[in-house]
Amino acid sequence: YSMHVVISFTLVSVTFFMVPRALVSVRRIKEVIELVESSEWILPTFQRKYVWDQEQICDLFDSIMRSYPISTFMIWKVSKATAGKNKFYKFIQDYQEWWREIGESFTPKMNDYYYAVIDGQQRINSLYIGYHGSYAVKLPRLHWKKAYDESIQPKTYLYLNLLEDADENTSRL
C-alpha cells in the first residue's frame, strides 16, 4: 500500500495521506509546481491527453482563491527500475491545441524514485499551465497549417488580480 498517496489541496497547501497508514505531510502549491518542474512528478502514458479548456482552468483557480476543495490526487511511487521499464510523460507547460496535448516523453535520470500521477493530472496540468505556462487554441475561421502557427493559435496567459475586488463587469478571474 505504500505505492499510493492521496493528496488534498487547500488554498496554499497540499495534504498527503499514505494509504493505509495515516502519514500526513503538508506542502504548498508552489512545492507541487516545483516537483512538476523538476520532473519528480510525471505522467504514465496510460493517462488521457490534456482536455481542459480555459474556462475550466479559470474555475480551478477561482476555487483555490475562494478556498474551496478541489478534490484529491492519487500518486504512484515508482522506483527508477520500474520507471525505466515503462513510458512516462512530463506535464505540459505550454498547451497548444492539436500540436501539444500531451507532455514531452520522460526518460528517468538519477532519482531513486519518481511519483506518477494516477488521478488528478488535469488539475495539476492546469495549475502548471496557469502558474508558468500558456494556452493556445485555434482562432475561428482560420485554416490549420502543417505546423504550429501563433497567428492561428495565439498564446494566452492567466493573470490573477489580487489587488482589487472584481467589479460587476468582471465575470471571470
What do these predicted ranges mean?
Residues 1, 9, 16-17:
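Aromatic (phenylalanine/tyrosine) cluster motif
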